Amino acid sequence: MNGKQVAASPRVMLKNQIDRLSKKGFQMKSGVECEYFLINQDGSDIADKRDIQSKPCYDQSALMRRYELIKEICDCMIAMGWKPYQNDHEDANGQFEMNWDYTDALVTADRHVFFKYMVKSLAEKHGLRATFMPKPFHNLTGNGCHAHVSVWNGKNNKFLD
């Protein structure tokens, strides 16, 4: 604010931790697993009325019904050099997850923020909405974002056993 960083900002706090590790000769890397729901335009329900399995995790049919949107998101990540490696239907009806390669923690954090904007924008283009809310539907599993964090010394992952 007023040209100064906000100390309590999550991005500033992450940069400070990265700097602390760097002074000790370490590098922080991370990857995230972003979960989201594809919902109808008014936000009242999931968008795919045929996604009704009682245990829908990894449902390929539901994933393929959203192929054009998932492909477009994935193609955008490829074009930006993110190296996506997994797209799947998650544990709840209407829920999906997309993953890309881990990298420097600040880059991953910035990509995560942009990913949400990109998914929401592309979903709208396809006549849908996307939500990353933790629990948009009381009767379905909620969204999460698993973060995998590692500390490196050169090419050595210090967290390996």
Where are these regions (language model features)?
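Glycine-rich, acidic/polar active-site loops that bind/position phosphate-bearing ligands
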Residues: 1-161
